Amino acid sequence: MDNQKNLILAIVVSCVILFGFQYFLAPKSQAPEPPTQTSQQAGAPQAPGASAPSAPGAATPNASGGTTPATLIPTASRESVLAKTPRAQIETPRLRGSINLVGGRIDDLTLLDYREEPAPNSPQIVLLAPDGTAEPYFAEFGWVAGDPSVKVPGNDTVWTSSGGALTPEHPIDLTWDNGAGLRYTRHYAVDSEYMFTLTQSVTNTSGAKVTLYPYALTARKGEVPVSPTYLYKVGPIGVFDGKLDNYKYSDMKPNGPNFQSTGGWIGFTDKYWLTALIPDQKEKLSATFHHVMQGKTDVYQVDYRGDQQDIAPGATLTVNNRFFAGAKQLALLDHYDDALGIPYFDHAIDFGWLYFLAKPIFEVLDFFYAHIGNFGLSIMLLTVLIKLIFFPLANKSYRAMSKMRLLQPELAKLRERYGDDKVKLNQEMMALYKRVGANPMAGCLPIVIQIPVFYALYQVLYVTIEMRQAPFYGWIHDLSAPDPTSFVNLFGLLPFTPPEISLIHIGAWPIIMGITMFLQQKLNPQPPDPMQAKMFMALPFVFTYMLSQFSSGLVIYWAWNNLLSITQQWLIMRRAGVSRAKPPGGNKTPAKAAKT
């Protein structure tokens, strides 16, 4: 098999990969996705453990062991619901919200650094919302009593606050006395990012031992986010005994999985946002992913329950929990992993099966961004770095391709001599390659080595919050989204908006990429077979269309990579004294040359 056929095979395989990538993995066109806040007091099917009490929720265990849906509260505006109950305000550089003093839930959080759209006046992202709104989503902590006669704080408990807003410099305490010898205290603290620390304590002033089980839950109700692609998952997620488990919301129906673990964490993950309950990493716990129906409404809940805790008369029991609610910033998740010992916290970002490659690529991009302040330029610098890393390999490949160009006249003679004897032709061709030290597969290598990097970079562009709404220059305002321009209206020069049809919605950067691919082809020898030549001529158009639906940052990478490859290949050809090859027979077509 000669060099041209091998090269065509590599390109066809690449096209198949990219077409499959686009069909199965690339997202369908959709409006930007703000976090979907959901859940009333979420469903609490039987918590793990046959004899242990359940973590409470809106659907509470009934006498038969099933669940009884709570009364649904008609939805109201967020502002009116927040005004109905006393609240302790949350004020940090990244968050604004409040803790409901009736029940003690963290059910009101807005992310100050992120907006739904790139426009500066776009609404800020609302992550958590209280019960009674259209999309409730909240976190709850508490105790379950071993003896049903023991009064524990519930969803209607009115807590007394120590006063002031919860800030990184000012923790707050909530207290409640059950009137029967138990005093409950919740100490809330928050850092300057997205991590809450909740210390629960119970002081027993009664004359008898009390048995309690600590619990924590996160719940959401109604319509939940759905991933439009297989690139990432949204839904319940957790790490149990050092193993990551993540699921789709549909996996929780009718009954979600249960886990036994020491330490770990559990929560809900969206594309860019995460809520996570984090117990003491030495604590043994039972965790559950729940789903129940409240009328016609889906209710989703993740929770964990700690081991039995006995509190002697006069003793105080203390349990520590953490709650993360915010953006999935890789450096921040790594920091919490290192500083707090939260295992695999960075895996909340779904880098997929090329995690080992995608994470370093992002870290390099983030390093460049810290110095130049633009992720588009960072992608270009990353491309140069990748070129330098693969330079010895690519250099060897291009030199081998140059040798193949010099062999074109000899190969043409062999085809003319042994054209009817394919076995003999292949034997003579391989002998020729061996004699001159040429590699017929050399042309495949520059294309093949790009595929893993291409996929990993796409994953980085698509799932990292840092790339969300990251601008480049000119018309590119979001590197994670496709090029917004279209050749139909001359890239915005004509005063109308073309329809959002992928067949015609091809922007400027994909066309630039196609041009660079066409120029790169001109440095390669023209195939002797007219059909092969037509296939090569069609490839830039095929790739232009395919990549027009991909992230603009990825198209910029591909175009810039082509330009660097053209420069490198031209310099090597010049040093080797090889001109752009023509088909045997000079300017004649291969078919005519064969007749002369």
Functional labels for PLM-detected ranges:
Residues 346-417, 424, 430-434, 470-474, ...:
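Transmembrane alpha-helical segments that form the functional core of multipass membrane systems
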Residues 1-388, 496, 579-596:
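Membrane-protein biogenesis/insertion across secretory and organellar systems
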Residues 9-10, 553-560:
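Hydrophobic alpha-helical membrane segments of integral membrane proteins
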Residues 459-514:
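Conserved catalytic motifs of ABC-family nucleotide-binding domains
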Residues 8-22, 454-457, 511-516, 541-542:
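Core hydrophobic alpha-helical membrane-spanning segments
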Residues 372-375, 545-555:
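Transmembrane helix interruption/hinge and helix-loop junction motifs
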Residues 503, 507, 511, 547-551, ...:
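Hydrophobic transmembrane alpha-helical segments of multi-pass transport and channel proteins
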Residues 182, 200, 314, 389-454, ...:
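Membrane-interface amphipathic helices and adjacent TM-edge segments
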